[in-house]
């Protein structure tokens, strides 16, 4: 079973541990999420909890969005996401999910959309090296050879194209601090996306896998 919360990336800062160690952290605003809908296997084919984050003015929302929010007795939301196979417990539509869903020291997976860089060449996009810059060279920043005697381009070739703007998950990040008063999570390291971009935080999958494997090994 999983648990999670939706949030907005604020920026990065640093904190000091009790040992005096400096730890870079990402500040994530996790204003209480509202449970918009509970999906079940019987009705929807899978189990999930739908959360809503960041209020949206009704004048900017359409009728279906307003009606969906009204069922949860809340306002329309800018960011709606699902937590699959969530720990339901006594949770019901309209309840709030707060920052204390996670504890300090827990590991989480954070999903966000990376910064978009537009159309870029191989040197910037794929970290390739440039050619000689002398007058006699005819190869400076172009892509290299695509292979010998082929009349097509193989899939996966590193060529110029759009860079960034992709959904990326950073795995196994540690929750350094849970600030319930300010509705903030401090997560060690960086998370994908620009400041003010939306992120989804779930408990770490690999952490659970490692624990289960260690238990099997000990048996």
Swiss-Prot record:
Give any Gene Ontology cellular component.
Answer: cytosolic large ribosomal subunit
Q: Please report a single Pfam family linked to this protein.
A: Ribosomal_L3
Where does the record place the region Disordered? 113-142
> Which InterPro entries has this protein been placed in?
Ribosomal_uL3, Ribosomal_uL3_bac/org-type, Transl_B-barrel_sf
Ribosomal protein as a keyword of this entry, yes or no, is yes
A GO MF annotation of the entry reads: rRNA binding
Question: A GO term (biological process) for this protein?
Answer: translation
Its keywords, alphabetically, are: Ribonucleoprotein, Ribosomal protein, RNA-binding, rRNA-binding
Which domain of life does the UniProt lineage start with? Bacteria
Which family, according to UniProt? Answer: Belongs to the universal ribosomal protein uL3 family.
Q: How does it assemble?
A: Part of the 50S ribosomal subunit. Forms a cluster with proteins L14 and L19.
Describe its function.
One of the primary rRNA binding proteins, it binds directly near the 3'-end of the 23S rRNA, where it nucleates assembly of the 50S subunit.
NCBIfam families from the xrefs?
L3_bact
Q: Which HAMAP family match?
A: Ribosomal_uL3_B
Q: What is this protein called?
A: Large ribosomal subunit protein uL3
Q: Which organism is it from?
A: Limosilactobacillus reuteri (strain DSM 20016)
UniProt lineage? Bacteria, Bacillati, Bacillota, Bacilli, Lactobacillales
């Amino acid at each position: 079973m999983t648990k999670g919360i939706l949030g907005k990336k604020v920026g990065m800062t640093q904190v000091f541990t009790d040992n005096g160690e400096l730890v870079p952290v990402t500040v994530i605003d996790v204003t209480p999420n509202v449970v918009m809908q509970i999906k079940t296997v019987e009705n929807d084919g899978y189990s999930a909890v739908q959360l809503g984050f960041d209020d949206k003015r009704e004048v900017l929302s359409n009728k279906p969005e307003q009606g969906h929010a009204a069922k949860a007795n809340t306002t329309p939301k800018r960011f709606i996401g699902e937590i699959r196979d969530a720990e339901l417990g006594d949770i019901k539509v309209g309840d709030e999910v707060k920052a204390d869903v996670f504890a300090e020291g827990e590991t989480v997976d954070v999903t966000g959309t990376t910064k978009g860089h537009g159309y870029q060449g191989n040197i910037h996009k794929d970290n390739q090296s440039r050619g000689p810059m002398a007058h006699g060279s005819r190869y400076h920043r172009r892509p290299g050879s695509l292979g010998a005697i082929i009349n097509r381009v193989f899939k996966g070739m590193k060529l110029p194209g759009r860079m960034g703007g992709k959904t990326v998950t950073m795995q196994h990040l540690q929750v350094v601090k849970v600030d319930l008063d300010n509705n903030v999570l401090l997560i060690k390291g960086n998370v994908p996306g620009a400041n003010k971009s939306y992120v989804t935080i779930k408990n770490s999958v690999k952490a659970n896998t490692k624990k289960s494997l260690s238990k099997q090994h000990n048996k």
